[in-house]
C-alpha cells in the first residue's frame, strides 16, 4: 500500500476510535512502531469493538464512546467468546470456502489486543502516575500455535526457495528471457520497469531484508560503494545490512534510470519508485508482492518476497554454517528462528549424498 494511502486509511480508523486508543497510537508511534503495524492493529481494534457492541457487552452507541470500564471488566469467558466468534464467523474473503478466520489471523488479533491491554494496565500513566486500570484479562487468554516440526516446515518451504545456481538463474531469466513471451503491449510496460524490478528482486535475494524494509528504503539509506543499506527493523531499531555483491550491477542500472524514467525530483526520497500520470510515488508492498509473484511463477513456482528472504538465509547458512551470522543478517536477536535453515541445508546435503 502506498504510504499516502496508508496514512489516509490510518486517519479514517483514528477518527472512530476511543480516546485511549489514540493515546496508545501516539505512544507506539514514538517507539516507533511502523505505520503498517499500527494500521493493522487499528483494524483489529475496530473488529473487536464492533463485536463488543454486537454482543451487547457495551451500551455505547458507537466505537468512540466505549469506555475504559468496559475493557477493565471483560471476563476471560467474554474473550473466549470473541475467539469463538472469530473462528466461526463467515469469511469475508469471497474466494475462500473456509468458515471463520485462520489461527494465524486470530493470533494476530489477540496479539494486537494484548498490546493494547498491556499499555492500559502497565505502560500508561494518569495524573497520579498510575495506569488506567490494573486488571489485564488478556493474560488469561491463551493462543494456539500451529503445530509443525522444523523438519516438516523445512520440507514444505524448500521447494519455494531459489537455492544454489537458481538465485542468479532467476535474475537472468527476468533479465533475458521473460520478455520473449510477452505481447508487444506487455513488452512496453516490462521494459519501463525492468531495471527497477531487477533491482528489487536482487536486493531481496542479496540482503534478506523484509518486504516492509525494502519498501521504506530511501535514497540516503543505500551505499553502493560499501554495499550496505540502512533499514528500520521490527520494533523501530535502525540497522545496517550488508548486501551481496551480485546485486550491485542491478542496483546501479536502476539508479541510472530512476530520475528520468520515474520523473523523480529532489523531494522524492523513496528508493523504489512507481510513476502514474507523471507523478512519482513510493512503490508499495502489494505491488512488489505481485511483481515477485509474477516473475517467479513464470520462472519456476510462485513465491512471495518473504521466500526470497528465506532463500538468502538458507544460502548464507550453507556457506558459513553460522546461525549467529544468519540471525544478524536477518535482524533477529536470537538464533532460535534460524534453526529452520539448518534443517533445509541438512536436507540438501543428504540429497547431494544420495546422488553420488
Curated annotation (Swiss-Prot):
InterPro entries: CB, DNA_brk_join_enz, Integrase-like_cat_sf, Integrase_catalytic, Integrase_recombinase_N, Integrase_SAM-like_N, Recomb_XerS, Tyrosine_recombinase_XerCD. It comes from the Bacteria. Its main location: cytoplasm. The keyword Cell cycle applies. Keywords: Cell cycle, Cell division, Chromosome partition, Cytoplasm, DNA integration, DNA recombination, DNA-binding. GO terms for biological process: cell division; chromosome segregation; DNA recombination. Residues 169-354 form the Tyr recombinase domain. Pfam families: Phage_int_SAM_1, Phage_integrase. SUPFAM superfamilies: DNA breaking-rejoining enzymes. Residues 16-121 form the Core-binding (CB) domain. FtsK is required for recombination. It is found in: Cytoplasm. One of its GO terms (molecular function) is tyrosine-based site-specific recombinase activity. The active site is at residues 210, 234, 306, 309, 332, 341. One of its GO terms (cellular component) is cytoplasm. PANTHER family: PHAGE INTEGRASE-RELATED, TYROSINE RECOMBINASE XERC. Site-specific tyrosine recombinase, which acts by catalyzing the cutting and rejoining of the recombining DNA molecules. Essential to convert dimers of the bacterial chromosome into monomers to permit their segregation at cell division. Belongs to the 'phage' integrase family. XerS subfamily. This is Tyrosine recombinase XerS. The lineage of its organism: Bacteria, Bacillati, Bacillota, Bacilli, Lactobacillales. The gene is xerS.
Amino acid at each position: 500500500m502506498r504510504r499516502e494511502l496508508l496514512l489516509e486509511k490510518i486517519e479514517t480508523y483514528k477518527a472512530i476510535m476511543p480516546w485511549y486508543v489514540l493515546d496508545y497510537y501516539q505512544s507506539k508511534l514514538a517507539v516507533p512502531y511502523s505505520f503498517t503495524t499500527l494500521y493493522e492493529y487499528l483494524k483489529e481494534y475496530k473488529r473487536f469493538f464492533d463485536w463488543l457492541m454486537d454482543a451487547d457487552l457495551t451500551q455505547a452507541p458507537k466505537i468512540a464512546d466505549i469506555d475504559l470500564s468496559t475493557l477493565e471488566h471483560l471476563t476471560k469467558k467474554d474473550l473466549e467468546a470473541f475467539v469463538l466468534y472469530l473462528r466461526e464467523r463467515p469469511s469475508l474473503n469471497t474466494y475462500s470456502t473456509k468458515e471463520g478466520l485462520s489461527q494465524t489471523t486470530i493470533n494476530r488479533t489477540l496479539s494486537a489486543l494484548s498490546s493494547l491491554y498491556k499499555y492500559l494496565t502497565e505502560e500508561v500513566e494518569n495524573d497520579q502516575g498510575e495506569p488506567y486500570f490494573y486488571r489485564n484479562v488478556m493474560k488469561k487468554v491463551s493462543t494456539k500455535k500451529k503445530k509443525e516440526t522444523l523438519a516438516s516446515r523445512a520440507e514444505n518451504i524448500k521447494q519455494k526457495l531459489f537455492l544454489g545456481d537458481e538465485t542468479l538463474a532467476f535474475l537472468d531469466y527476468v533479465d533475458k528471457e521473460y520478455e520473449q513471451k510477452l505481447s508487444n503491449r506487455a513488452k512496453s510496460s516490462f521494459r519501463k520497469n525492468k531495471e527497477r524490478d531487477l533491482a528489487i528482486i536482487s536486493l531481496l535475494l542479496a540482503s534478506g531484508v523484509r518486504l516492509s524494509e525494502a519498501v521504506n528504503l530511501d535514497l540516503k539509506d543505500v551505499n553502493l560503494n560499501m554495499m550496505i543499506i540502512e533499514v528500520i527493523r521490527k520494533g523501530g531499531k535502525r540497522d545496517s545490512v550488508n548486501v551481496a555483491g551480485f546485486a550491485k550491477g542491478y542496483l546501479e542500472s536502476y539508479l541510472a534510470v530512476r530520475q528520468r524514467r520515474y520523473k523523480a525530483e529532489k523531494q522524492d526520497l523513496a528508493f523504489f519508485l512507481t510513476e502514474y500520470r507523471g507523478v512519482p510515488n513510493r512503490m508499495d508492498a502489494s505491488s512488489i508482492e505481485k511483481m515477485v509473484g509474477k516473475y517467479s511463477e513464470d520462472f519456476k513456482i510462485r513465491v512471495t518476497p518473504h521466500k526470497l528472504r528465506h532463500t538468502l538465509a538458507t544460502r548464507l547458512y550453507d556457506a558459513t554454517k553460522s546461525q549467529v551470522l544468519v540471525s544478524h543478517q536477518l535482524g533477529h536477536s536470537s538464533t532460535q528462528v534460524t534453526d529452520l535453515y539448518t534443517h533445509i541445508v541438512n536436507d540438501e546435503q543428504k540429497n547431494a549424498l544420495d546422488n553420488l
